[in-house]
Amino acid sequence: MAAASSSDSDSGRAESNEANSKWLDAHYDPMANIHTFSSCLSLADLHGDGEYKLVVGDLGPGGQQPRLKVLKGPTVLTESPLPALPASAATFLMDQHEPRTPALALASGPCVYVYKNLRPYFKFSLPQLPPNPLEQDVWNQAKEDQIDPLTLKEMLEDIREKADVPLSVQSLRFLQLELSEMEAFVNQHKSKVIKRQTVITTMTTLKKNLADEDAASCLVLGTESKELLVLDPEAFTILAKMSLPSVPVFLEVSGQFDVEFRLTAACRNGSIYILRRDSKHPKYCIELSAQPVGLVRVHKVLVVGSTQESLHGFTHKGKKLWTVQMPAAILTMNLLEQRSRGLQAVMAALANGEVRIYRDKALLNVIHAPDAVTSLCFGRYGREDNTLIMTTRGGGLIIKILKRTAVFVEGTGEVGPPLAQTTKLSVPRKTRLYVDQTLREREAGTAMHRTFQTDLYLLRLRAARAYVQALESSLSPMSTTAREPLKLHAVVQGLGPTFKLTLHLQNTSTARPVLGLHVCFLYNKALYALPQAFFKVPLLVPGLSYPLETFVESLSSKGISDMIKVLVLREGQSAPLLSAHINMPVSEGLAAA
């Protein structure tokens, strides 16, 4: 009876959670064998029949060949092998002709494979890069039998370590061979031309000339050679090429190519670069404190996930808006757009199995998955508008549908004021002294204000007089003269009785060196001893800080200290250019003795 009641309570709790959830569980297959990333998922009406299908670039784990899969509902409609691992998948309209059937672009290796009606349509290959001239020369020597394979390997390894241009695939394969296989490889490939090919790291789409949903779009490619390429949607020619300081891994775009657009690229060096139309190099740069793991544009805010388990919000000019800490590491991110309610939010899948949905830094919803989610996609699937598709680390497929009555509310989901507004503040009671002071301020407010203003003016006058006196007597550590613009500061090191005194003297002019200066120390000879109280300063080059070191010996055993004055003098002048007063510390060695 107890077991039966426990089972009934668990089932009742599950039904209650499902009733309170904003999502309907449409499908869950833990053995779907789909291993992919968010960039390799795309939803599109591939046949123009109103039935949206899911395009998956499957990585093919466990030695399996990568494959392109198209799913209709929970079942796989078609499969086709890929020559290399997929980097990204996107659907776009190539032209304005009827019927308006979108094309499918899949980036894999150095190529973009374009499909129409799920049939191969076009293959775009990245242009080849010029090879390393040193590498070309080494292979020419091997072609003429001037060097043996072992020498060839040593020279290629030396080039790989020192050269900025990476080696070709042919040379990299040769360096991986055993000694017995090298000679046959050299004889087979020494007559071939050295080719250096880059690969695609990320891809997205950019509207060509209209912002409409059914307008033609260009493909934007990020490559391993630190470049961004914009392709024409019909001829597949390169319309624009932009350079980046590092390899792009995530891309976000806005605008139209023929009007005005903005490209945002998150790169491997931990920075985010923002480019505008007609700019060959980045206009803005956002430096992150950790590597980015995702980039999503929500309205005009760039949301970045980092390896420090946090989400950051930035403007398009790089200004940081907010930061939200996550309870676990972020695995992947994507955009949630509910067009019927005008909602845009960011989805972040965490390593603890949670999928968190944020609007700015406000938490809207949390989904608990049975396994860590590695890819996310939200949009129209089949004939349902708001469908969430997730794949898990173990290869599972999860499909959820957002309820039509679901409304996302910030925080815990409860409508009303936050709990902090209902908490009473512990305001202290008014004391007799507080009441008397309030009455006094009301009665004598004008006189109190006049007294305050008089004291303030006197303080400003005394400060101005002291400043003028310091300038006239060169008591300041900075020189205000145009001929000798100098800056001085001192550092005392040690516990005593011997201290190390370091003077940092800097010529702050832009192009004029300073010569003929001397340094003089004024001190109490009964308390301190210096090896040299007057010495000449070398030539001061503009912009450099010169450390001038000396040692100070404390002679007093009574635990007292005094001030040492440092004067910077010009030869032939009695007034010092600079001066500094150094308060010496108490000698701990003599005090302890």
Swiss-Prot record:
Q: Where are the transmembrane segments?
A: none
Q: Which SUPFAM superfamilies match?
A: Quinoprotein alcohol dehydrogenase-like
Q: Name one GO molecular function term.
A: signaling receptor binding
- Subcellular compartments: Cell projection, Cilium membrane; Cytoplasm; Cytoplasm, Cytoskeleton, Microtubule organizing center, Centrosome, Centriolar satellite
Q: What is the effect of changing residue 390 to R?
A: Knockin mice exhibit olfaction deficits, male infertility, ventriculomegaly, retinopathy and obesity
Q: Which InterPro entries match?
A: BBS1, BBS1_N, GAE_BBS1, Quinoprotein_ADH-like_sf
Pfam families per UniProt: BBS1, GAE_BBS1
What follows loss of this gene? Mice are anosmic (inability to perceive odors) and have defective olfactory cilia. Significant reduction in olfactory sensory neurons ciliation in the olfactory epithelium with decreased cilium length and number. Impaired cilium localization of the BBSome complex.
**Protein transport among the record's keywords?**
yes
Q: Name one GO biological process term.
A: adult behavior
For this UniProt entry, what's an example GO CC term? ciliary membrane
Keyword tags: Acetylation, Cell membrane, Cell projection, Cilium, Cilium biogenesis/degradation, Cytoplasm, Cytoskeleton, Membrane, Olfaction, Protein transport, Sensory transduction, Transport, Vision
Kindly list the positions at which N-acetylalanine occurs in this protein: 2
On subunit structure and binding partners, the annotation says: Part of BBSome complex, that contains BBS1, BBS2, BBS4, BBS5, BBS7, BBS8/TTC8, BBS9 and BBIP10. Interacts with the C-terminus of RAB3IP. Interacts with CCDC28B and ALDOB. Interacts with PKD1.
Role of this protein: The BBSome complex is thought to function as a coat complex required for sorting of specific membrane proteins to the primary cilia. The BBSome complex is required for ciliogenesis but is dispensable for centriolar satellite function. This ciliogenic function is mediated in part by the Rab8 GDP/GTP exchange factor, which localizes to the basal body and contacts the BBSome. Rab8(GTP) enters the primary cilium and promotes extension of the ciliary membrane.
What name goes with this protein?
A: BBSome complex member BBS1
Q: Which organism is it from?
A: Mus musculus (Mouse)
Q: What is the lineage of its organism?
A: Eukaryota, Metazoa, Chordata, Craniata, Vertebrata
User: What is this protein's gene name?
Assistant: Bbs1
